[in-house]
Amino acid sequence: MESYIKHGDCLKVMKDIPDKSIDMILCDLPYGTTQCKWDVVIPFDKLWEQYCRVAKDNAAIVLFGAEPFSSRLRLSNLQMYKYDWIWDKVKGTGFLNAKKQPLRNHEVICVFYKSQCTYNPQMTSGQRKVSYRRKGLQTDVYGQADEDYIYDSAARYPRSIQVFSADTQKCSLHPTQKPIALLEYLIRTYTNDYDIVLDNCMGSGSTCIAAQNTNRKYIGIESEESIFNTAKDRIKMNKTQLQLF
C-alpha cells in the first residue's frame, strides 16, 4: 500500500481501507471543547468500529486528549485501553481563567491495542554501567531476591512524561497542531520502517510529515477542505526537501 491523503468524512473514507492493514493509528481527535466548526466529537461507537477493522491486532492506537474528553475516550473502549503518556507542552494555556484555576501545560496521549503492540523504547543517555553483588533480601511482596545485581544505566528507558515544545513559533497552521518531533517520537516507538500510520483527522498534515521523516508510509484524512489543501501543500514540500537531502 502506498502513502496517500484524502479529503472527506473519516468514517466514510476509512471504509475504503482494507481490513487489518494499518500498523499504527496516531490521531488528534476533535475534543469538542470549542465552538470551532471542525471541533465536533466523532461518535465513539462508529469510530471504534472502523479502528478495530482496519488496525492489525498488534497495532497501537495512539490518541491525543485532554479532560474531559480524555476520560470519555478511555471509557469508550476500556477493554483495549492500556496506559497514558503525558505530554508536557512547556508553555501553559488557559490564561483567561488563570485567577480561577492553574494554567494547563499538558495533554494526555492514550494508548490502546488488542494484543501486545510493537514497542521500541526510545532510549536516552544515562550514567555509566555499574555491576555489583548484593546479599539477597527476603521481602513480603516478592520473596527472596536474587543475590547478583547488574545495574546497567548507560541508556535509560523512557518515562511516561515527555517534554516537547509546540511548533507554533516555527509553523502554526492549525489551532491544535502537534509538534512534529513528538509525533516522530511516537511513530518510532510503535512502528518499524515501512509500516503504515493512519491519521484520520490529519489537520495540517503533521503526522504524515512525521511518517515521511521516519521512513514510514501514511494515510491521512481531513474533512475541512481548506485545511486539507494546506496539508497537501505542506506534505508535498516536505517530500521534496527529503528527496533533496
Language-model-derived ranges and their functions:
Residues 1-229:
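Core catalytic lobe of class I
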Residues 232-245:
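Short, conserved SAM-binding/catalytic segment
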